Regions:
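Alpha-helical transmembrane segments
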Residues: 19-33
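N-terminal Lys/Arg-rich, disordered targeting/topogenic segments
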Residues: 1-19
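Generic signal for short, ordered secondary-structure residues
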Residues: 15, 19-22, 110, 262
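Solvent-exposed, non-transmembrane regions of membrane-associated and secreted proteins
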Residues: 31-317
């Protein structure tokens, strides 16, 4: 007897190919829908953030009606009398201080909230300041734990743009020596997305000043460094933000030097350990790096016109 004939198999390549095409079409369709929903959500969040900021600006920038304030006549000061005891013997020369001492707000010894901030803090008591860079930023600054405002606007409503916030470790009971502000690097330019403009030398020369007013005092700052730094210890770009905020003069001096060495600009604006620093920090494409725009408070014996001329004349990339 001969072997039984094998049943010939029939392969339906065409049907399988059609199923594959249908599956790919479904996958691409789902991706398109999800992407569209995200884009719409981002657009809505951006619009809501802009509207919320605009309404708060109206409150913050509204002109205050002049009020009559009572004039306090200072009590007469009794001049010191000469000491009747023999002067103490001369001791060894005092060593220079190694730590910065707390400083009260000039003219606001008890840290009273200004009337301008009393108005905006009715919207949210977390509002502690207002940041202004002409033509770029005009936003409220809030403070709570560092996670809270990453995805919430200044009102506490969910928003992918987040809010500009002051580092949680910054104590405003006295004037801080370092103010660390964080904000998202939004592609729309919202929050700290516009800080990328400072990588253009011409822009920096034309916009070297920042206004940051807190609830307790106004502040005007001059930019001395623009850098992309690393948060990874051991990297040549590493800058320790903790040391920049340290009251230890040596630590602070070393951290300022490290920041200056990583700046893309070389400028003649000097920085001292006892200067009040303002650091605007945002993320970049690398998760372990940050863009930093660093400024110091303008000193009492300085004027903006002279500083601006100095920056335009001496700053190089």
């Amino acid at each position: 007897m001969g072997r039984p004939r094998r049943k010939q198999r029939t392969f339906y390549f065409g049907k399988r190919r059609n199923w594959g095409r249908c599956l790919m079409a479904v996958v691409f369709g789902v991706i398109l829908i999800v992407s569209s929903v995200k884009l719409i959500s981002y657009g809505v969040d951006y619009y809501n953030a802009q509207q919320a900021s605009a309404s708060l600006r109206e409150i913050y920038h509204a002109e205050e009606e002049p009020t009559a304030e009572a004039t306090n006549t200072p009590a007469p000061v009794t001049p010191p009398t000469a000491a009747t005891t023999a002067p103490p013997e001369a001791g060894p020369t005092a060593t220079p201080p190694t730590r910065l001492q707390p400083v009260r707000y000039p003219g606001n010894f008890y840290a009273n909230v200004s009337s301008r901030f009393q108005k905006v803090r009715r919207q949210n008591s977390d509002i502690i300041g207002w940041l202004t860079i002409d033509g770029l930023i005009d936003e409220a600054v809030v403070q709570r734990d560092n996670e809270y405002y990453l995805d919430r606007d200044y009102r506490g409503y969910h928003n992918v743009n987040g809010a500009i916030f002051l580092d949680e470790t910054c104590d405003l009971d006295t004037r801080p020596y370092t103010l660390l502000l964080y904000g998202h690097n939004m592609k729309t330019g919202a929050m700290f997305g516009s800080l990328r403009n400072y990588e253009n030398l011409t822009f920096y020369r034309n916009n070297p000043f920042i206004t940051f007013d807190t609830a307790y005092e106004d502040g005007r700052y001059v930019i001395f460094a623009v850098a992309t730094v690393s948060t990874t210890s051991g990297s040549w770009r590493y800058v320790d933000f903790t040391r920049l905020s340290s009251p230890v003069i040596a630590d602070r001096t070393n951290a300022i030097s490290a920041l200056l060495s990583r700046s893309i600009y070389r400028t003649q604006v000097d920085v001292a350990a006892d200067d009040q620093l303002l650091l605007l920090v945002t993320c970049v494409d690398d998760d372990m790096e940050r863009r930093v725009v660093a400024a110091r408070r303008i000193r009492e014996d300085e004027d903006e016109a002279t500083l601006e001329k100095l920056i335009r004349r001496t700053t190089k990339k």
